[in-house]
Amino acid sequence: MTLWNGVLPFYPQPRHAAGFSVPLLIVILVFLALAASFLLILPGIRGHSRWFWLVRVLLSLFIGAEIVAVHFSAEWFVGTVNTNTSYKAFSAARVTARVRLLVGLEGINITLTGTPVHQLNETIDYNEQFTWRLKENYAAEYANALEKGLPDPVLYLAEKFTPSSPCGLYHQYHLAGHYASATLWVAFCFWLLSNVLLSTPAPLYGGLALLTTGAFALFGVFALASISSVPLCPLRLGSSALTTQYGAAFWVTLATGVLCLFLGGAVVSLQYVRPSALRTLLDQSAKDCSQERGGSPLILGDPLHKQAALPDLKCITTNL
């Protein structure tokens, strides 16, 4: 046991960015680096296929980045209220402040900003994060917040999400976030698989993998949306009530799931309706010999293909 619990007493405590965490920043930077690397080699691609590959790669990177990034975003549910409320325990002092609650898959983020910021001879600008990851103890974090003497609005909202609270918010959001996170990781795995399969002679399976990606992304959204059907405990700060709404992470994930379903459905439909057009679109290469002949090409990527094509002898050359 070290003095001051291993914390330097004369320096400010580390602050958390409201709604923007370090893992989220790392994910964004990694995918931006991949996109920048592709843009560097883009001028080396000739012809109209350059724009096709630009759209294809950037769209695929966006889907993958979104699926990973929302795990670390705190903006699945967002609530904001301006109120006049008590400031500290055992004190009659009141402050006018803006309180914001962000709920993510791994915890909550509470911000308290005075309006104006300087009141009661101090700066009222708090941002506290409470997590419920597998290795984190939410109750212990709340106990530490009590020892630090955080403002009443922060402690009030944090207490509503404790496991022992009669509101039951902890169990609802924790369980929903756990299932949403699991389904999103499955969606990410199928996204990786779809990129591989769409680059093979079997684009049909790539389309099916995209459909599965969209389905699991929507499963994660529905897991979080199921909380709305349960009456939640009211959150009152002073004379105002704080209500949460779907945040940016929720809507972006919903849009990504619908986009994956649309793209996957388009690939599967083209495979059965216009397989040659799909192959030309995905490969962006010269037509093969059977297409030059004007005959029906042999589609190796279609498992339901029943035709048998004879080899084109004009395309066979021998070196004597």
UniProtKB/Swiss-Prot annotation:
Glycans are attached at residues 84, 109, 121. Residues 43-56, 205-206, 269-320 are cytoplasmic. The keyword Ligase does not apply. The chain crosses the membrane at residues 22-42, 57-77, 184-204, 207-227, 248-268. InterPro entries: Dual_oxidase_maturation_fac. GO terms for cellular component: apical part of cell; cell leading edge; cytosol; endoplasmic reticulum; endoplasmic reticulum membrane; membrane; plasma membrane. The keyword Oxidoreductase does not apply. It comes from the Eukaryota. It is a multi-pass membrane protein. Specifically expressed in thyroid. Also detected in salivary glands. Required for the maturation and the transport from the endoplasmic reticulum to the plasma membrane of functional DUOX2. May play a role in thyroid hormone synthesis. Belongs to the DUOXA family. Heterodimer with DUXA2; disulfide-linked. Interacts with CSNK1G2. This is Dual oxidase maturation factor 2. It comes from Homo sapiens (Human).
